[in-house]
Swiss-Prot record:
Needed co-factor(s): heme
Source organism of this protein record: Acremonium sp
Name of the protein this chain belongs to: Cytochrome P450 monooxygenase ucsK
EC code: 1.-.-.-
Parts of the chain that traverse the membrane: 7-27
Length: 526
C-alpha cells in the first residue's frame, strides 16, 4: 500500500509521461511519413513550435520565421508533425489542384469547422473538395465577370459616394484612407450581395467603428490555431460571458452583423419566391446572392437552411472588406508618395475621363489602360491578399516536388497537410526583383509585352478554391482609383510613411501596423 502513496504515483506518472514524449519524439522525427522532409526537429515533434511565433510571445510572426526556415533548409520544409510548407511559385498550381485533382482544406488551419457558428457551414470553411464544389455551384454566376458588369451601377454608386464624402471633408483635417476604403468596401459588398447597405459612408467616421471591429475579429486566429477546441468552446458561450474577452466578443459582434444582413436577405428571397416575384427575367437590381442560392437547382434543400446561408453571408462580408480596402490603401500611398507615377496614371485616366466632372468610365474601359492595370497588379502583390499559408490536403494522390537546385525529389503523401504563403510568393526575388519596392513597370517588358510577373500573383489564390469575388474586387479597384485620382486633389498628411502600408503580422490576413495609418489631407476638387 505504501507504494500507492501520492508522491510515488506522481513520480510514476511523470516517468511514464516522459517515456511517452520520448517515444513520440522518436516516432515523429525518425519514422513518421514526413520524416524525409527537412526542417527543425522541434517543429516535426510539436505544433507548439509554430505557436511560439504565432500566438505567444510573438503573435502573428510565424510567417517571417518561415522565411528564415526556407533560407536554412531549402524550398520544402516540414513545419509541423503532419504539415509541409513549400516556397516555390512554380509548384503553386500543382499544389492547389483543379477539378480533376482534388484538394481538401486542412482542419489544422480551418479551426472553425464543426463549430456551429463563425461560418463553419460556409463555402469558405467547407473542407471536402466535392462538398465545396457543390456549394460554390450554388452561387451560380453571381460573381462572374458578366454579372459584375451587370451590377456595376451598385459599385459605382458607392465609389462616387466616397468621392463626395472626401470632397466634403476638404480642409477639415486628415482622413484615414484605410477607414474610408473599408467603409466603401463594406457598403459595396453588403449592397451587392444583399441589396442592403450598411451605410458606413453615411457615418461621420466613414465606418471606422466597423473597420476596427473586423480588424479585432481576426486576432482570435493565432489563439484558435493553437487551441482550436478552447476557441470553439469560448465562441459557444453566452454573449455576456464573451464580453469578458475583447478578442472573442468582437468576433461575436461581427457574427451578429452578418446574421442580420443575411437573414433579412434570405427572408426577402423566400417571400419573393413564394409570391412568384423572382424569375430569370427579373431586373438585375432586384436580385441578391441569397436569391440566387435559394433559387438554385444545384443546391439540395438542406443546403438552403438559415444557418447555412448566414454562414456564407458572413464570409462574403469578411472576404469583400479587408483585402480590397488594404489593397487600395497600398496603391494610394504609393501614388501619392510618387508624383511621377501618379501623373502617369492620371494621364491614362484622362483619355477616358477628360475632366474631373466627366462620367466615371466603365470597368471594361479602365481595364484597357495598361499602366493603371500594372499599378493594380502591384497593389495586389504588396497587399498580399490572405498573407498566411493556405493549407490543403490531396486525398487521392501523392505530390512529388522536384528541387531543381540540388536535383532531389520529395514526396508529399496523400492525406498530409501542405501549403504555400502568398507573402513568400510575392516577395520571391527570382520573380520580383527588389520585391518590397512598388514597381508597376515589372509587369511590362521594354518591348511593350507582358512579363511573367502577373502569372505568379496569388493574392486571390489559385485552383478550384480561388476567391470567388475576384471580379468584384478588381471592379472596385479600377473604379475607385479612377474616381478619386481623376477628381480629388489630396496629399499625404505629415508623418505618413511606407511603414504604414507594410505588413507587420499575419493573422490569416496581413495586418498593417498600429499607427495613425495612411492619412491624407483633401485640398478639394482637381
Amino acid at each position: 500500500m505504501a507504494l500507492l502513496n501520492t508522491p510515488v504515483l506522481a513520480a510514476a506518472t511523470a516517468v511514464s509521461f516522459g517515456f511517452y514524449l520520448a517515444g513520440l519524439f522518436v516516432y515523429r522525427v525518425f519514422y513518421h511519413r514526413l520524416s524525409h522532409i527537412p526542417g527543425p526537429r522541434l517543429a516535426a515533434f510539436t505544433v507548439y513550435y509554430q505557436s511560439y511565433y504565432d500566438f505567444f510571445p510573438h503573435q502573428g510572426q510565424f510567417l517571417w520565421k518561415l522565411v528564415e526556415l526556407h533560407k536554412a533548409y531549402g524550398p520544402i520544409i516540414r513545419i509541423g508533425p503532419d504539415e509541409v510548407h513549400v516556397n516555390d511559385a512554380r509548384f503553386y498550381k500543382e499544389m492547389y489542384g483543379s477539378s480533376v485533382h482534388k484538394r481538401n482544406k486542412s482542419p489544422i488551419w480551418y479551426w472553425m469547422d464543426g463549430l456551429g457558428a463563425v461560418g463553419d457551414q460556409s463555402m469558405f470553411i467547407t473542407l471536402d473538395h466535392d462538398h465545396h464544389r457543390l456549394r460554390k455551384a450554388g452561387l451560380g454566376t453571381y460573381f462572374s465577370k458578366r454579372k459584375v458588369q451587370e451590377l456595376e451601377p451598385r459599385v459605382k454608386e458607392k465609389v462616387l459616394l466616397l468621392r463626395q464624402r472626401l470632397l466634403e471633408r476638404a480642409g477639415r483635417g486628415a482622413i484615414n484612407l484605410k477607414d474610408a476604403f473599408g467603409g466603401m468596401a463594406l457598403d459595396i459588398i453588403t449592397q451587392y450581395c444583399f441589396n442592403q447597405c450598411m451605410g458606413a459612408l453615411d457615418r461621420d467616421d466613414l465606418g471606422r467603428e466597423w473597420n476596427q471591429l473586423m480588424a479585432a475579429g481576426v486576432k482570435i486566429n493565432p489563439f484558435a490555431r493553437t487551441f482550436p477546441t478552447v476557441a470553439r468552446t469560448l465562441l459557444r458561450l453566452p454573449k455576456w460571458v464573451l464580453g469578458v474577452s475583447g478578442m472573442v466578443s468582437t468576433t461575436g459582434e461581427f457574427l451578429d452583423l452578418a446574421d442580420r444582413l443575411s437573414a433579412n436577405a434570405r427572408n426577402e428571397a423566400i417571400r419573393d419566391l413564394q409570391e412568384g416575384k423572382y424569375t430569370l427575367t427579373d431586373d438585375a437590381d432586384s436580385r441578391t446572392v441569397l436569391h440566387s442560392m435559394m433559387r438554385s437547382d444545384v443546391l439540395p434543400e438542406h443546403e438552403k437552411g438559415e444557418r447555412r446561408l448566414q454562414a456564407d453571408g458572413m464570409t462574403l462580408i469578411a472576404a469583400g472588406f479587408d483585402t480590397t480596402s488594404r489593397t487600395l490603401t497600398v496603391v494610394f500611398y504609393h501614388l501619392l508618395a510618387k508624383p511621377a507615377m501618379r501623373a502617369r496614371v492620371l494621364e491614362e485616366i484622362r483619355t477616358l475621363m477628360p475632366t474631373p466632372s466627366s462620367p466615371l468610365p466603365t470597368v471594361a474601359q479602365l481595364e484597357q489602360l495598361p499602366y493603371l492595370t500594372c499599378v493594380i497588379h502591384e497593389g495586389t502583390r504588396l497587399a498580399h491578399g490572405v498573407a498566411g499559408r493556405l493549407v490543403r490536403i490531396a486525398p487521392e494522390e501523392d505530390l512529388v516536388y522536384h528541387n531543381s537546385s540540388d536535383d532531389t525529389e520529395y514526396t508529399i503523401p496523400r492525406g498530409a497537410t501542405f501549403g504555400q504563403s502568398s507573402y513568400l510568393v510575392h516577395t520571391d526575388e527570382s520573380i520580383y526583383p527588389n520585391p518590397h519596392d512598388f514597381i508597376p513597370e515589372r509587369y511590362w517588358s521594354d518591348d511593350g509585352k507582358p512579363t511573367d510577373a502577373e502569372r505568379y500573383l496569388v493574392a486571390f489564390g489559385k485552383g478550384t478554391r480561388m476567391c470567388s469575388g475576384i471580379n468584384l474586387a478588381f471592379a472596385e479597384l479600377y473604379l475607385t482609383i479612377a474616381a478619386l485620382l481623376g477628381a480629388v486633389d489630396m496629399k499625404l498628411a505629415p508623418g505618413t510613411t511606407e511603414h504604414d502600408v507594410s505588413l507587420v503580422a499575419e493573422l490569416f490576413v496581413g495586418v498593417l501596423p498600429e499607427s495613425p495609418g495612411v492619412r491624407v489631407n483633401v485640398v478639394g476638387s482637381l
